[in-house]
Every structure is written in C-alpha cells, then in structure tokens.
Amino acid sequence: ESILFFETSDNKVYAHTTDEFFEVKFKLYELEQIIPFYYCRISKSSIINTKVIYSLEKSFSGSSTASFYDSKKQVHISRHYYKILKDKLKEMR
C-alpha cells in the first residue's frame, strides 16, 4: 500500500512512493496481473493505488489529476480511464 502509483517513462516502469521512486522490472500490463484489485489503470502509462487517493480534480478541458494523502505528487488521469476509475472508487466504498 505504500506505492502511490506506477508510471512508465523512457520505456521503464517506476513505482512511486510518498517521497521517492524506484524502477520495477515489469511492464504495466504484467503488473496489472499481479497487483491487488484496488490498483486501477488511469492512462496508457500509469496505474494508481485507489486506497491512497486524496482528491480528483477535473479541469474544463477534460483532463484530470489525482492527488494523494501525505504527498505532493500528482498524476494525470486520461479522459478514457476517468469513468473506469470513478466506478472503481464507488465499488470500493
């Protein structure tokens, strides 16, 4: 649960914690098969831990951002995955 999100950058996958990040030796699609159910894909390049989301902000342009408890980090949510994330959060209540 200490991992806030996974993200790809330069063909590498990184796991982000509250104040650091480290490289992971899996592809995102491989991670989706092995991480707990409360993680959710939010873009082609990111998977988020839904248990640590503090807020979701949606702008007029349609882009969205997730913020986390106890961290200044934020992550972009693509329009395509926004509803999937919202449904996942409702399901977990």
Predicted regions and their residues:
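Conserved binding/recognition cores within well-folded domains
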Residues: 1-70, 74
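Intrinsically disordered, low-complexity N-terminal regions enriched in serine/proline/glycine
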Residues: 38, 80-81
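C-terminal structural segments of small proteins and small subunits
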Residues: 72, 76-77, 83-84
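Charged phosphate-binding loop/patch that engages nucleotide di/tri-phosphates or the phosphate backbone
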Residues: 84-93
